[in-house]
Amino acid sequence: MKTIIVVTIFGILTCAYPTDGEHCAQEKAMEDFDPSRFFNGKWYVVHYGKTGPTVCQKFSTNGTQGAPTQIVETGYDKFEDYLKFQCDETGKKNDYHYSFKCKSYECGSDNIEFEVDFTVLSASYDDFALVCRTITFTSGTKDKDDEVLVLEREKTLDVIDNCRRTYYLTEFEKMSLSSQFLSKKENITMLSFQLK
């Protein structure tokens, strides 16, 4: 009898917490999302699920069809040493998922290619946003990685104060997300959206 209960509980937990690479596809996107308000100005990533290098992302339109182009700079220690990637929008998978194809164009860098999908879960446009980002590497190991990003318009040295942490936890719980995304030490990252 104890074995049946343990197997049942394990099965329920397995369904409740999907494996990596599936979180963003299962999350409910913001229904009244306005891309023109979101893809404008600067955003700072104050938290993401896994520790890693600081990433600077700059978005601008390519001028021909009004689709944003994402410039990604990945580096350590405040961008003292970084690589640049250009990511062009490839279209939307549906009404809520914005997709980009990225490649390094720098001389001397490895030919790293990856695809990025953004799903905006919640946004106030002037203050904060919750975004689920899926990165799929199309070269090399072809790994897939999902992360929930907490974005703010203002860069602060205080990572997330207790008041905001409580608010973010409430937002995560409403969307049935695991609090595992909030268990790591936060890094400051910048997203800059500009229209040409």
Curated annotation (Swiss-Prot):
Alphabetical list of InterPro entries matching this protein = Calycin (IPR012674), Triabi/Procalin (IPR005657)
Q: Where in the cell is it found?
A: Secreted
Q: What are the annotated GO cellular component locations?
A: extracellular region
Lineage of source species: Eukaryota, Metazoa, Ecdysozoa, Arthropoda, Hexapoda
| Secreted among keywords | yes
Q: Name one GO biological process term.
A: symbiont-mediated perturbation of host defenses
Positions annotated with a glycan in the UniProt record = 62, 187
Query: Where would one find the signal peptide in this protein?
Result: 1-21
Q: Which GO terms describe its molecular function?
A: toxin activity
What the record says about family reads:
Belongs to the calycin superfamily. Triabin family.
UniProt entry keywords in alphabetical sequence: Blood coagulation cascade inhibiting toxin, Glycoprotein, Hemostasis impairing toxin, Secreted, Signal, Toxin
Q: Which organism is it from?
A: Triatoma dimidiata
Q: What is this protein's record name?
A: Dimiconin
Keyword Secreted assigned: yes
The record's tissue-specificity note reads: Salivary gland.
Q: What does this protein do?
A: Inhibits the intrinsic blood coagulation pathway by blocking the activation of host coagulation factor XII (F12) but not the enzymatic activity of activated F12.
Superkingdom, according to UniProt? Eukaryota
